[in-house]
Amino acid sequence: MMLSHNPIVEPFALAHATIVTGDKAGTILRNMTIVVGADGRIEQVAPSIETSIPAEYHYLDGTGKIVMPGLINAHTHLFSQGKPLNPKLATPKGQRMVATFAHSPLGKPYMAATVRHNATTLLESGVTTIRTLGDVGYEVVTLRDQIDAGQILGPRILASGPLMAIPEGHGAPLIALTSGTPEEARTAVAQNLKAGVNAIKIAATGGVTDAQEIGEAGSPQMSVEQMRAICDEAHQYGVIVGAHAQSPEGVRRSLLAGVDTIEHGSVLDDELIGMFRHNPNALRGYSALVPT
């Protein structure tokens, strides 16, 4: 969680709380005190009986309360409320109408307010780090910078900007930059990087939200060569690449291209699992699955 650079009015101590550590063993620590300084940083975590709370610190009784580490949401879309889509807006015509509004002078301030509201909701739900993977424009990059500068309160954000898709592919036209060749794909990645993104997203296959017929979701869309160009361009700047892939073939192609994270995923056989574990084209030599 990022806090304003201005000091908090009062440092505080939360006493007699139960802490869920989140470690592999499932450790639970009871009757603990957490001391937080004026800069918003945790200064001490110790048994309450052993903790001396400075007189100037505000005392909060945590009896019966649970404290846990901040949650991480590694796959978010802040432009969306997470509610079921209106079927009329899921049609090609409906998608074009939504995209036209979202990218208009009237729609851009609306999207900026929406992503800020949704980021606040996540923070208040205990999520302190998020990665967006498909934004309307660069409104989340702006929000991230405002949070990092201490101008507003919010979670840590890794922002992708628009995702990479083929023409009329998954996510287009609302949240995608489209390209038909490896060269065009590199240009799209460069545009996102120049805007300050710290994540890149590829629509490697079709998706459920905008599929128009059975079998479209999971059907491979982007070529290995085009995805490889995207990965190479992003990896030059140390930026990891995630790929929307909802079929075994979509996962395989993405891993061959050097994608760092597979989003959503599919049934995995031993060969695919081996490709995750040893992926020489990925930034760190391996890839990870982010199931949703």
Question: Where are these predicted regions, by residue range?
Answer:
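Histidine-rich, glycine-flanked metal-binding segment
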Residues: 3-10, 19, 23-68
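Metal-associated gating/positioning segment near the N- to mid-region
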Residues: 66-146, 257
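Hydrophobic faces of well-ordered beta-strands that scaffold small-molecule active sites
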Residues: 70-76, 130-131, 157-161, 200-202, ...
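Active-site gating loops and adjacent loop-to-helix segments of metal-dependent hydrolytic enzymes
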Residues: 80-111, 153, 161, 165-173, ...
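Short, acidic/polar
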Residues: 111-119, 178-192, 246-250
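Short, well-ordered coil/turn segments that N-cap beta-strands
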Residues: 127-129, 151-156, 197-198, 237-239, ...
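Active-site core of metal-dependent hydrolases
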Residues: 167, 206-292
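Active-site gating/metal-coordination segments in enzymes
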Residues: 168-228
